[in-house]
Design a protein with these regions (language model features):
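Rossmann-fold dinucleotide-binding core
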Residues: 4, 95-162
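Alpha-helix N-cap/helix-start capping motif
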Residues: 10, 33, 64-67, 98, ...
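Generic leucine side-chain signal with a strong bias for well-ordered alpha-helical environments
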Residues: 9-12, 20, 27, 64, ...
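A short acidic, helix-capping loop that chelates divalent metal ions and anchors anionic groups
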Residues: 37, 70, 125-129
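Short amphipathic alpha-helical segments
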Residues: 17-18, 41, 72-75, 102-105, ...
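NAD(P)+-binding Rossmann beta1-loop-alpha1 motif at the extreme N-terminus of oxidoreductases
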Residues: 1-55, 59-62, 88, 93
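Rossmann-fold NAD(P) dinucleotide-binding segment
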Residues: 50-114
Length: 162
């Protein structure tokens, strides 16, 4: 199984990460503001930065409050982009401004890294249940690789386009 990095462990991200751990996935987790000892006690590895998460993961998922946080976490100083492994896939599950998503995607593409924009709907109860709706856009091959992972967090997982 691929090692998954998970950045953003708030209201939505924490239960999503928990569902991945329960499904047997190895996670490396980080949140700039929230503590994540509970996830470490379930078997996740804690990281001290976005860059460290990327350096230890093959698939990096972000679930952050808004566009500025996503941009900072992925392409900002000390961000995911600085620690990427060859062949990594970045999946942003936040609901953000499409222009920021395109900017992040272009920066990752320049590093030869696949990017999926995969926002969710369903709110905290569905995040806890693992029954979110996930609508992704991006590279089809990358989507097919991460789809089994996304299916541990959602029951409706579709690729809507590139």
């Amino acid at each position: 199984m691929a090692i998954i990095g998970f950045i953003g462990l708030g209201t939505m991200g924490r239960p999503m990460a928990r569902n991945l751990i329960k499904a047997g996935h190895k996670l490396v987790v980080y949140d700039k503001y929230a503590k994540f000892d509970d996830l470490v006690s379930l078997g996740a590895e804690g990281a001290v930065s976005n860059k460290e998460v990327a350096s230890k993961s093959e698939i990096i998922i972000t679930m952050l409050p808004n566009s500025p946080q996503v941009k900072e976490a992925i392409i900002g100083p000390g961000g995911v982009i600085e620690g990427l492994k060859k062949g990594a896939i970045v999946v942003d599950m936040s609901s953000i401004d499409p222009d920021v998503s395109r900017e992040v995607g272009a920066a990752l593409e320049a590093k030869k890294t696949a990017f999926l924009d995969a926002p969710v709907s369903g709110g905290e109860p569905k995040a806890i249940e693992g029954t979110l709706s996930i609508t992704a856009s991006g590279d089809k091959a990358a989507f097919e690789k991460v789809k089994p992972i996304l299916e541990k967090m959602g029951t409706s997982v579709v690729l809507a386009g590139h």
